[in-house]
C-alpha cells in the first residue's frame, strides 16, 4: 500500500500533512539519514585536514567535489540504498558507513581511505550531531518564523483595538475595565522572552568516542590533540561542544529546547482559551465562509474551531516535550538505548506545535471585533467604578472609603444614577466630584490605550 494522507496512521502525515510538510526536511527518516551522512562526511574531511593524520592525505579538488556532491545530491533513491544496507546490518548508522564505503570506490583518492569512514566513532557521535543539526535548522527555518507570524498577527489585532474598552473579568466576575488591544498585546509581551531564548539556545554535541574518553582515538593516534580536534569539528558545524559525557550527549540541550517550547505553547494555550471565551461572550465575531458548515445539525453555528484545534494540538505537543525533558536527561550508567526511540519522535512534538500555530494564525484572521457587545457589558456594570471612587476618596482622606463603596456596591446591580447620587454626598473638592461624575465604565481604562500604542 502506498502511503497517502488517507491511509497514514498519524494525522501529522494524514489530515494535517499540508501544515506539517515544512518540517519533513528536518525530522523525517530521510532527514535523519541525510544528516547522518553529512556528519560522517564532514568528520572524514576533518581527518583529511589534520596534518598529524598522514594516512588520510589532504583531499584533492576531485575528492572534495565528490564528497560535496554526495551531500548536495543526496535524494530518496540514495536513501533507499542505505536502507538496503540496513536490512543486512540491522543497524542504521552502520548502514550509512557501508553506503559510503561503497561510494568511495568511485573516486580514485577516496577508495584508499575507506578505513577512515566512521573512524574512532561510536554511533552516538554521529547521531547526536545529526539530531542537534535537525533541531537547530527546524527551529530557525520553520518554528521561529511561524511564531513570529503569530506574534505579528496578535500585535496587529492589539494595535487595531488599542482603545476598544472591555470589561475585565477576574475570577469570572466583572472587574476594572481594560481595552481589548491591551489584553492582546499582553500575550505578545509574554512570548518575546521564550522566543528569544529559543533563538539563542545552544544545543551541545559530543564527539568523544564510545564512553566519552577518546579511547580509540588515542590508541590509534596518541600524538593527535583529539580534544582540540573534536571540539573544532563540532563547533565548525555551528554547535556547542560538550567535552564531558558518557557514550551519549546527555540531552540537557534538547531538554532546554523542550522546556522553552512548553512555555511558548502554554502562553498560546492561554491565548486560545481567552479568545475562545471572548468569542463566547460575543466580543469577537468570526468571518464566515459560505461553503463551510459549523454543525451537522445546527445550520446557524459558527464555531471557534481554529482555536479549539490549536488548544488540542498544543496539549499533545506539550505532553511530548515534557516527556523529552524528563526522559532524555536520564540514561543508565554510560548509556542505555531507551532514548533512541524517543528521539525519533522529536519531529512529532514540533509538528503538533506547528499544526497549532497555523490554526492560531488562521483563527486570528477570522476575528472581527463586536463593539456593541463590549459596550453592552460595560454599560451594565457601573459597579466597576467603585475602585476609582474609593481611591479618589482616599486621596482626600474621606473616612472609610473602601468600606463605604463595599456597602454600596458589593453584590448589587449599580447604575449611573446610583453612583452619581453617592458621589454628590462626598466631602471631596468639587473638581474631583466633577471628574468622577464624568467617569464611565467605557472611559475608565487607565493607561491601557497608551500602553498598546507604546508597545513594539
UniProtKB/Swiss-Prot annotation:
Keywords: Lyase, Purine biosynthesis. It catalyses: N(6)-(1,2-dicarboxyethyl)-AMP = fumarate + AMP; (2S)-2-[5-amino-1-(5-phospho-beta-D-ribosyl)imidazole-4-carboxamido]succinate = 5-amino-1-(5-phospho-beta-D-ribosyl)imidazole-4-carboxamide + fumarate. N(6)-(1,2-dicarboxyethyl)-AMP binds at residues 15-16, 90-92, 122-123, 247, 296, 301-303, 309, 335, 340-344. One of its GO terms (molecular function) is (S)-2-(5-amino-1-(5-phospho-D-ribosyl)imidazole-4-carboxamido) succinate lyase (fumarate-forming) activity. It comes from the Bacteria. CDD domains: PurB. Pfam families: ASL_C, Lyase_1. The active site is at residues 171, 295. Homotetramer. Residues from neighboring subunits contribute catalytic and substrate-binding residues to each active site. Catalyzes two reactions in de novo purine nucleotide biosynthesis. Catalyzes the breakdown of 5-aminoimidazole- (N-succinylocarboxamide) ribotide (SAICAR or 2-[5-amino-1-(5-phospho-beta-D-ribosyl)imidazole-4-carboxamido]succinate) to 5-aminoimidazole-4-carboxamide ribotide (AICAR or 5-amino-1-(5-phospho-beta-D-ribosyl)imidazole-4-carboxamide) and fumarate, and of adenylosuccinate (ADS or N(6)-(1,2-dicarboxyethyl)-AMP) to adenosine monophosphate (AMP) and fumarate. Belongs to the lyase 1 family. Adenylosuccinate lyase subfamily. This is Adenylosuccinate lyase. The lineage of its organism: Bacteria, Pseudomonadati, Pseudomonadota, Gammaproteobacteria, Legionellales.
